């Protein structure tokens, strides 16, 4: 069956009653799913920023000069083929924007502009009219306007200078205008497809159950742990009302995965609440190798015929810290996250030490969780 407007009105009060007794772990439906056909699209273009105060691209940036010559030729200005103008006030830039879902012609977009060449700063510049294309090569928007640059660069004649933030990138608020709309099957398809942001069989089953309890049997059908098909009204106004009711529906999500995430570049470690550790003895010590090298000068006496020589002297020492041994207590459910944190702090371990300990625990089979290294 396909729900109509009368059914939606009939069950509106029932929806409010259903939402009240849900547990605190329930989340709004649209916070756990994406609607297929309602998505953002990325746009990109190539343009020129003019009006810079001598901080533009240098003469060795050939594509900037070529771009200016091509632009001038469109206005009837022809330069000799062997002439490469010096353009300190112009910079070649990449222009990008995000096209919102179901956006209409005439709406404005925020524009991001980034330098491509060797320009020092885009502060004070103006982006000339630039078409923005999608992945299919079609023009969906145009951009133009004055840049807002948060970075500052200052340099003296001696070559010394100072740079604050990033002066080679800027924004143009509402600097783009949508010229073409993206066609979507959302408004014409007989079903609405819900894609789970974090796939899970329990969550997919709960979504199917809650929607069918509200609108009737066979309205929602879970195709997999990541996709649910929902029959929706064909009339656009009824479909909007139908989705508004789905938006207010709370869903109990499945259990969160037990996961430890380690960023090797920054040393950041995030340990999920459901990570458990079983009985294990842990000892972690640091081994430090120091190599000190000094140079001695061998100077012969004044009447000798020897030569002055430089002799290196190397001193190698090894220092091994005594590592403490800690035994995590065990229980039927494993050691909690707080106990893990307290134990690591008592050992005085750094983030890298902690990651080494967790990897060793996982290899020993004492860690209930997934290790993810970024």
Curated annotation (Swiss-Prot):
The keyword Signal applies. Keywords: Bacterial flagellum, Periplasm, Signal. It is found in: Periplasm; Bacterial flagellum basal body. Residues 1-26 form the signal peptide. GO terms for biological process: bacterial-type flagellum-dependent cell motility. GO terms for molecular function: structural molecule activity. GO terms for cellular component: bacterial-type flagellum basal body, distal rod, P ring; outer membrane-bounded periplasmic space. The keyword Acyltransferase does not apply. Assembles around the rod to form the L-ring and probably protects the motor/basal body from shearing forces during rotation. Belongs to the FlgI family. The basal body constitutes a major portion of the flagellar organelle and consists of four rings (L,P,S, and M) mounted on a central rod. This is Flagellar P-ring protein 1. It comes from Photobacterium profundum (strain SS9).
